[in-house]
């Protein structure tokens, strides 16, 4: 969709999903996570790349190059604006906008006094990673140590691969594999200018064992790698310090929307499933023969009308192979659906 929208120079590209947009943290881990009402392309790219699942990182680049806005919308709340991703505003204020995390991170630590000022050492090291088909994510270095992270979402990281890699690396340095780890990333513009405001955050990390710290060259993120076992408990505390307590310069309504907890509280209670009211009837049918697939025509009609109300869809089709019952097809035809038969 992003590529088509970019090629057509569309007014916007809409991504419809099961959540209202991108949040300042994973709302299932941090109920106080705030909706991010507006992001620029680069911020959204960083959030998506460092752990957020709602948006694939590769869908942002074509929209950015074509200057096409990208909207994230909720299928269950079609009138809710969600998250709007577009060009950077000239008056954008520096500040952390999101905290994201990834589990299953593997660290490979390499040290040796011989690496200091040795020409081509890193080339020799990374050639061995390439030999085993491994893509390096984060890098931290000193005069006598280089530590890199491997992201399992981009690599096949198992004990056999790591053993072969360690054996190859042992030819040029001492090797230590540290796992399982998790990365926690603070995302926002102007991270270098915000370091003096992160004292409480640094103190929080100071209570745990931090294996690696990496700051991006584009000044958009600051990443800490810790033991996987402590990461989940740290996220709510970090969010409280940075976002919920409004410690950052950026806190305007144009950036932060309501929290996930507020949105869930305000959401209308879901109606009871139709089958609960007809339980006795269904059990009687089950006595005749099982298994049976049961459709409620009133429920089908209601859902068809909800789909019909989505303005972003030009045409709607029903796959006949799902259930070809004449009454079901008749209802869908009355609601303006076409039919797909394969």
Q: How does the language model describe each region?
A:
Residues 1-261:
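C-terminal catalytic "cap/lid" subdomain
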